[in-house]
Amino acid sequence: MRHALITIASSFIGVLVALIAFYTWRDATQARIQAAAEAEQQARAERGRQLSENLLAEEREFQAIRNDVVAVSGARVAVVESYMNSGRMPASNAEAGLPAAETYKGHSLVSLTVAEGGAITLHFDAASGVDGGAIEWLPDLTGVESMGVQWECSTHDFKQIVRALAGCTYTPR
């Protein structure tokens, strides 16, 4: 009988140890799974935060470009007035009746230059997203009698220019 009691007691202790080991293993596994899920959630939140910051920075850059383009829109009017008065497109800021290129400053604009044929080039600093970036406005005189001077906007520097200026196109160099 004593032997049977020892066998039952040792079996009970063995089962108890096995249950404790199982629950300890299960809790450790669940803790690892929970930690991995929390780490993934934190990583997603960080990626989302970084994406939001990048989008906000891009939007600030585009807004700076938009504001500067609106602020200097009178330069296109001056070029057209010069053309209407003289019959030819101006080849410089002075011929268009505009101040020197470097006097044009804005949120990110550092200069505005009128070149041969009335082409207007806006140069930007790093606040635009591309230090030294440029946007060019080319006059189109093909329908000047019926529609007036039309302007074509293009850039080689701002890939997402259409987000800032809907009518502007990006062409890689």
Regions found by a protein language model. Give the residues of each.
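Hydrophobic single-pass membrane-insertion segments
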Residues: 19-33
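Hydrophobic membrane-insertion alpha-helices, especially the h-region
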Residues: 7-22
